[in-house]
From Swiss-Prot:
Annotated compartments: Golgi apparatus, Golgi stack; Prevacuolar compartment
GO CC, one annotated term: Golgi stack
Gene name per UniProt: USP
Protein name: Unknown seed protein USP
Comment, domains: The BURP domain located at the C-terminus has not been identified in non-plant proteins.
Miscellaneous field: Most abundant mRNA species from cotyledons at early stages of development, but the encoded protein does not accumulate in cotyledons. The USP gene family consists of roughly 10 to 20 members.
Length: 268
């Protein structure tokens, strides 16, 4: 199928979190994008202590990250069963050690085995830009500096809770080489923002088995030469460097891409 770029009329803005307390981070957001509510994905960055009482990504949500599939699977009518078909487990590292930095911020941490330092201070790949941020202002500054403009938009998923079976309703391409900001799975509120080259981001409209409609941020990697061959074969029965490989992005992350069609930022 032909993937169309998102237009202003086709943008679906997610429900935004209601923030009543004034914070410097939110004030800074409003100073750059007036009258644009802060997306729920970034609300943890306003917690005064910078620490949540539990891990932000629950075991049920891990399925959103662990299903790998082909780019040609992104078409209306395709069925996805999260955490079952083509799943490589709830905690995965699809790239080998030599390119570990490429995916440190994509795949979730096992708290008992990895630390924030493993994600934030590991070597980066060639042409990769990576920053860990613990404040909303820092994130805003990083993405604006990267794109050289405030005309950008943030896009995220809104997977329905306790739903694993979905049917694709529509697919929209939103951009290449997006900057991904992932909430790391620790109590301390830290987002890892990075750009991985040779990637394409999509918003996939899904319908759950109970009829609930949702949007899924999806990233396809076109350069898979560094992927772990055992995991890739287990999931898709292909070898690294042969075909693009895609995965969904869960609710605790967002993709920043240029906004060529609107004056104001719109968060999906």
């Amino acid at each position: 199928m032909e993937f169309a770029h998102l237009t202003v009329l086709s943008l679906f803005c997610l429900a935004f979190v209601g923030i009543t307390a004034t914070s410097s981070g939110e004030d800074y957001w409003q100073s750059i994008w007036p009258n644009t509510p802060l997306p729920k994905t970034f609300s943890d960055l306003l917690i005064p202590s910078g620490i949540t009482n539990s891990l932000p990504i629950k075991s049920e949500e891990l399925k959103q990250y662990s299903t790998l599939f082909f780019e040609h699977d992104l078409h209306p009518g395709k069925n996805f069963n999260l955490g079952h078909t083509n799943s490589v487990g709830s905690i995965i590292r699809p790239f080998t050690k030599s390119r570990q930095g490429v995916t440190d911020s994509i795949w979730l941490a096992n708290k008992e085995k990895q630390s924030l330092e493993d994600f934030c201070y590991s070597p980066t790949a060639i042409a990769e830009h990576k920053h860990c941020v613990s404040s909303l202002k820092s994130m805003i500054d990083q993405v604006i500096s990267h794109f050289g403009s405030t005309k950008i938009k943030a896009i995220s998923s809104n997977f329905a809770p306790y739903q694993d079976q979905y049917v694709v309703e529509d697919v929209k391409k939103v951009g290449d080489n997006a900057v991904m900001c992932h909430r790391l799975n620790f109590e301390k509120v830290v987002f890892n923002c990075h750009q991985v080259r040779d990637t394409t981001a999509y918003v996939v409209s899904l319908v759950a088995s109970d009829g609930t409609k949702t949007k899924a941020l999806t990233v396809c990697h076109h350069d898979t030469r560094g992927m772990n061959p055992e995991l890739l074969y287990e999931a898709l029965e292909v070898t690294p460097g042969t075909v693009p490989v895609c995965h969904f992005i869960g609710n605790k992350a967002a993709a920043w891409v240029p906004n060529h069609t609107a004056d104001n930022l719109c968060v999906m």
